[in-house]
């Protein structure tokens, strides 16, 4: 990433994030803005008086635009909050069907017949593995879910999200049935944003998972046989971190002091935070509002179709560029051929032997090769 451009670079932003303090970040951004303002003022000073007046008029228009945009963000937030409340009854109905709290029309008879069976535990309630399947059908989340995670995620009953105001951001709540993996009934992930309207993440915090002994999915235990002749005959055990969806609840930690981290580590931290935000926003914006479409796979197909359309557009643009380049290459080749023809003509004209005491080429019209001293130098 280049640090030479006038816009905010990652190094400045990361330094602010590393400080872990909102006020410090604001100061960094203000200082950056001040520097940019100085550069821009130099630009306007170099303009002629008439052009400078026109630019000032444009800046006034931009100010009006920014004021309208601020109102847009304010009204959009209010509108989203309004509809978020309207969605809640629908989410409640979905929860009840998925978890077998209520039965839908047409399924009552089947359930009643199943109740007569001796093994009532075999009766399926609701929609088994609903959230697990929905998340696995999403490309971003599928990469995070391991086979070991799947059994635990089958106990996931619901996912909800809500806005938070102080500080700005949002939180995700994952509701679990009683399960053999951890004690928590709710796992929460909270994102604190620098600006709610711009996806600039300040930090993320999450519930600490209370794993039952030997059930932690984010760690694996390696056992090594003791060396031959060793007094200790017991195998050596070593615990290592491993890939798991539940690492989502151990977000990247931002150091309190920016001096505790070097530039490479800061960039890696920035990448991890962006990836973490991508997972959270995918759950908030895609999975929760369209869960059944992800469960059936329809949403994945739509996503794939959109991706193909984008790739086709990119391919068309690349093809156009390639055609333009080919035409330019052909024109260049034609120009080169014309230059070569002109050069050959000049060479033929200048190939007439000068008067000298040396013997010229054979005069009998035969195409014998000229002696070396007669060749055009």
From Swiss-Prot:
Read off the domain note: The acidic domain is probably involved in the interaction with histones.
Q: What does this protein do?
A: May modulate chromatin structure by regulation of nucleosome assembly/disassembly. Could function together with B-type cyclins in the regulation of microtubule dynamics.
Where does motif Nuclear localization signal map? Answer: 223-228
Task: Say if the entry is tagged with keyword Protease.
Answer: no
Protein family per UniProt: Belongs to the nucleosome assembly protein (NAP) family.
Q: Which GO terms describe its biological process?
A: double-strand break repair via homologous recombination; nucleosome assembly
How this chain assembles, per its entry, is:
Binds preferentially histone H1 in vitro. Interacts with CYCB1;1.
User: What gene does the UniProt entry assign to this protein?
Assistant: NAP1;2
- InterPro entries, A to Z: NAP-like_sf, NAP_family
Localization recorded for this chain is:
Nucleus; Cytoplasm
Q: Which UniProt keywords apply?
A: Chaperone, Coiled coil, Cytoplasm, Lipoprotein, Methylation, Nucleus, Prenylation
What is a single Pfam family found in this protein's UniProt entry?
NAP
Record propeptide residues? 375-377
State the name under which the record lists this protein. Nucleosome assembly protein 1;2
Segments for region (Disordered): 298-377
Q: Which residues form a coiled coil?
A: 26-80
One GO molecular function term of this record is: chromatin binding
Please give the GO cellular component terms listed in this UniProt entry: chromatin; cytoplasm; nucleus
For this protein, the record's Gene3D superfamilies field holds:
1.20.5.1500, Nucleosome assembly protein
- Where the record places motif Nuclear export signal is 47-62
Q: Which residues carry this modification: Cysteine methyl ester?
A: 374
Ranges annotated as biased composition (Acidic residues):
299-342
Q: Say yes or no: keyword Glycosyltransferase present.
A: no
Lipid modification (S-farnesyl cysteine) maps to: 374
